[in-house]
Amino acid sequence: MKTSLRAVAALVAFLLSLLPLEARVTRVEILSRGDVLGGSAFGKAGVYERLTGRVYFSVAVSNPHNQRIVDLDQAVNLKDGQVEFSADFIAVRAKDTRKSNGSLLLEVPNRGRARIMALVDGGNWDLASDAGDAWLMRNGFSVVSLGWQWDATGVDALKLYAPTARENGKTIEGLLRGDVMPWKPMSEIPLGHLIQAGIGGTEYPVAVPDDPRNTLTVRDWRDAQRTLIPSAEWQFAQIVDGKLVPSNRHIHLNGGFEPGKIYEYVYVVADPVVAGLGFAAVRDFASYAKHNPDAIVPAERVYGEGISQNGRFLRDLLYQGFNADEQGEMALDGILAHVAGAGRGSFNYRFAQPSRDAQPTSSVFFPTDIFPFTDQPGKDPVTGETGGLLDLSASQNVTPKIFFSNTSYEYWGRAAALIHSAADGTSDVALSDHVRIYHFTGLQHFSGPFPPQKGAADGLGQEPQSPLPIKYFWRAMIADMDAWVRSDRPPPPSSYPRIAEGTLVTLQAYAWPAIPGVNRPHEASTGYRLDFGPNWRQGILSIEPPKVGPLYPALVPQVDADGNEHDGVRLPEISVPLATYTGWNLRDPSIGAPGERLAFEGSYLPFPRTPADRQKSSDPRKSIAERYSSREQYLGRFAQALDELIKQRWILPEDRRAIVHRGEEEWSEVTK
């Protein structure tokens, strides 16, 4: 009898081991595990460990919360009403999870790169030898970076492993489009979307190289007329060992590609990946962490974090209703979507291209900056379409606390004004109680280096980049979000330019001071009314390139006599300035198209040192000597401005010394 009972108990234990860890996370595979910095203790949470591996998921096709996933019902691995997929992860958690603060920061990695800990804490992104000041760990946070992009490039990229789709067992074909503006003469270009040293997405190879629907065009700027390049002048090929050989991932052009021109290609592709499962991965991992006590990173609260591409991903997750899990419960309790502007993205389409954004001279006319833009319902006066970003989450009662934060660049390069203004550009709009919008003035998309310097290669601009740091705002935002969700302590109020106050204006009203030798832009990015065919709202794009309708209005922050923006959250470098910081930087003539804006970059324009310098250069801005009688006076005013930011909870008190030091460094830099 005892033997029989033991056998039954063993069988029950075995069967339990086969059950999913949670309804939609079926298992977790840990590939590596180790203590952070040799077992060093971090605050009350003590020793932290870093884990890598893969999470396995399964979703029910019939569940209403999954039915927006494009082609889910056509997945090749559909079995018994379920579709399985998996995703890479990196987790950093207290070794004794009971010592954590209960809050999980769930990073949606930008093109597969886990970077939030390096950004917030400093040090190595992988904590290999340097954890910076370990702010996140000292404060007990858990951090997970989860793959969601199926085609992320790079050996270290965190990826989504999703099935392809077939229609009744037959191959699905379609048209795919890409574009590029070379920064130097090139004989060939790779298919896919690659930015800044090969980061991006591989996208799809050409399926039928000789199909007459494959086209290549060239034009001089975004809205210029396309010129068709004869098919005899180009082919899908690349040079290998001095010989031209066929390639399904490259285009070779006789005579080469010229810098400063936009080349756009359309070609036939096959076997679409069910890319929308990336939304399900983020959603279901968040729910798993909150509801399964045996989760690898158990949490009471989960905050989705995304920067740029992944900030757009989080905006789209909200819009498409993916913050409700399969049980209808809230997945993410808070969302920090940074530098997403007005964008969403190509995340849940047939033949989705998740790396594509909307840069000034590439990734043009993609389904990125598309209506609706505001969190509350609005109306497009041209199309008559109505809606808001939070419509579905509100109807499902799963709207999280939200920070939409942007820098000066997003108003010029990502149409950020559309998130808080009417679609006709004539008025401000009210925000949801769940939302805060923060505009960090003078910063660029990604913080530039200090001392300031120009970019390189395709990032070479006419001016040095804006060096203002985002790090300190990030730390305060995470602390504010945690307090808002945990104890309902309101965060700082929204801070952004407004039409009613005259601080959000048209390009014609932009009061830029005429600084000698500095070229200003005469256009800014905005949203387009696009038509990709009759089924594109259901995720199937059939017209490439799309039909383009009227543009949405372009509005930008107004500036003062120095060229610095009036409204928003102003670092002391803006309140007590030594320079002008902009959200734009024009392309250097050496890389072509010198009248166009660079992607991602702002400008740093120091004031003249003395009245004599000012007079010599005819600079309209006051000199440093006319503003400040001494270094001590400057630093005193700098500290006062900083203390006001700390009082208003934009900056943490512990970061005061580091920011004052930056003020000291900038004074030394501009007065040397």
Language-model regions: role of each:
Residues A9-L18:
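Bacterial N-terminal signal peptides
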Residues M1-L5:
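N-terminal secretory signal peptides that target proteins for export/translocation
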Residues R24-K672:
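C-terminal His-loop and adjacent cap/lid subdomain of alpha/beta-hydrolase
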Residues L19-A23:
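Sec/Tat signal peptide C-region and signal peptidase I cleavage site
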